[in-house]
From Swiss-Prot:
InterPro entries: IV_Tat, Tat_dom_sf. Asymmetrical arginine methylation by host PRMT6 seems to diminish the transactivation capacity of Tat and affects the interaction with host CCNT1. Interacts with host CCNT1. Associates with the P-TEFb complex composed at least of Tat, P-TEFb (CDK9 and CCNT1), TAR RNA, RNA Pol II. Recruits the HATs CREBBP, TAF1/TFIID, EP300, PCAF and GCN5L2. Interacts with host KAT5/Tip60; this interaction targets the latter to degradation. Interacts with the host deacetylase SIRT1. Interacts with host capping enzyme RNGTT; this interaction stimulates RNGTT. Binds to host KDR, and to the host integrins ITGAV/ITGB3 and ITGA5/ITGB1. Interacts with host KPNB1/importin beta-1 without previous binding to KPNA1/importin alpha-1. Interacts with EIF2AK2. Residues 1-48 are annotated as: Transactivation. The gene is tat. Zn(2+) 1 binds at C22, H33, C34, C37. Residues 38-48 are annotated as: Core. It comes from Human immunodeficiency virus type 1 group M subtype B (isolate MN). GO terms for biological process: DNA-templated transcription; positive regulation of transcription elongation by RNA polymerase II; positive regulation of viral transcription; symbiont-mediated perturbation of host chromatin organization; symbiont-mediated suppression of host innate immune response; symbiont-mediated suppression of host translation initiation; symbiont-mediated suppression of host type I interferon-mediated signaling pathway. Keywords: Acetylation, Activator, AIDS, Apoptosis, Host cytoplasm, Host nucleus, Host-virus interaction, Inhibition of host innate immune response by virus, Inhibition of host interferon signaling pathway by virus, Interferon antiviral system evasion, Isopeptide bond, Metal-binding, Methylation, Modulation of host chromatin by virus, Modulation of host PP1 activity by virus, Phosphoprotein, RNA-binding, Secreted, Transcription, Transcription regulation, Ubl conjugation, Viral immunoevasion, Zinc. The record marks W11 as: Essential for Tat translocation through the endosomal membrane. This is Protein Tat. It comes from the Viruses.
Length: 101
């Protein structure tokens, strides 16, 4: 083994980097090109930021999908169907007719 210059950083040692540059190709040869290519391409591990996927936009002429959707029925409310105002009036009438002494 050849002696390595101690002043060189470990990533700049001879033989630490491949002679050819990394590519975006995913063939077997390129996947095993170097350790970085192996982890990114062969194993699929990347620690960078995840890109946001854009939502697919519907073509402009496809407006029929909106028309074919059935309308939902109005929500059914539980409790007194007359509403809170009328129920208060009923309570007031009952208290007027039956005063508590």
């Amino acid at each position: 083994m050849e002696p390595v210059d101690p002043r060189l950083e470990p990533w700049k040692h001879p033989g630490s980097q491949p002679k050819t540059a990394c590519t975006t190709c995913y063939c077997k040869k390129c996947c095993f090109h170097c350790q970085v290519c192996f982890t990114k391409k062969a194993l699929g591990i990347s620690y960078g930021r995840k890109k946001r996927r854009q939502r697919r936009r519907a073509p402009e002429d496809s407006q029929t999908h909106q028309v074919s959707l059935p309308k939902q029925p109005a929500p059914q409310f539980r409790g007194d169907p007359t509403g809170p105002k009328e129920s208060k009036k009923k309570v007031e009438r009952e208290t007027e007719t039956h005063p508590v002494d």
